[in-house]
Amino acid sequence: MRLNDVKPQKGSKKRRRRVGRGISAGQGASAGLGMRGQKSRSGSGTRPGFEGGQQPLYRRIPKLKGFPVVNRKIYTTINVEKLADLPANTEVTLESLRASGILTAVKGPLKVLGNGDLGVALNVKAAAFTGQARSKIEAAGGSCEVLG
């Protein structure tokens, strides 16, 4: 077999249908576009989103208010109840939580949230604390340190 012997697979090369070239060609007269109407005329159809004069969807739905925060801080969050499993007087940081397997996906600096109860005293170092989280950690005898 040589390069000049290579032929395309049977049925892989389909000829383009020539429409509107007489009734015996199979797609004569209206060329498969139907009888009348805007979609059968030249210059084909309507723009995307046009609903025939009905108020289109993009104008029926109200505009969104506000604007996105440009420099939004994305935190890795953890609740106080997850910290309750750690032994007492442990220093809790993002790295230590990752090493212990409590946190797996790290999206950014650590933020401690106040859901759940805490019964052990811990030294927690994080970028941010919620008010509830701070009060629960300090009530258990621990300390909160905000990292810059």
Curated annotation (Swiss-Prot):
Function as written in the Swiss-Prot or TrEMBL entry: Binds to the 23S rRNA.
Name of the protein this chain belongs to: Large ribosomal subunit protein uL15
GO molecular function terms listed in the Swiss-Prot or TrEMBL record: rRNA binding; structural constituent of ribosome
Region (Disordered): 1-57
Listed Gene3D superfamilies: 3.100.10.10
Subunit structure: Part of the 50S ribosomal subunit.
Swiss-Prot/TrEMBL keywords: Ribonucleoprotein, Ribosomal protein, RNA-binding, rRNA-binding
Domain of life: Bacteria
GO term, biological process aspect, one: translation
Keyword match Lipid biosynthesis: no
Family that this chain belongs to: Belongs to the universal ribosomal protein uL15 family.
Gene: rplO
Biased amino acid composition, Basic residues: 10-20
Species of the source: Trichormus variabilis (strain ATCC 29413 / PCC 7937) (Anabaena variabilis)
Ribonucleoprotein recorded as keyword: yes
GO terms under cellular component: cytosolic large ribosomal subunit
Lineage: Bacteria, Bacillati, Cyanobacteriota, Cyanophyceae, Nostocales
Gly residues composition bias: residue spans: 23-35
InterPro entries linked: Ribosomal_uL15 (IPR030878), Ribosomal_uL15/eL18 (IPR021131), Ribosomal_uL15/eL18_sf (IPR036227), Ribosomal_uL15_bac-type (IPR005749), Ribosomal_uL15_CS (IPR001196)
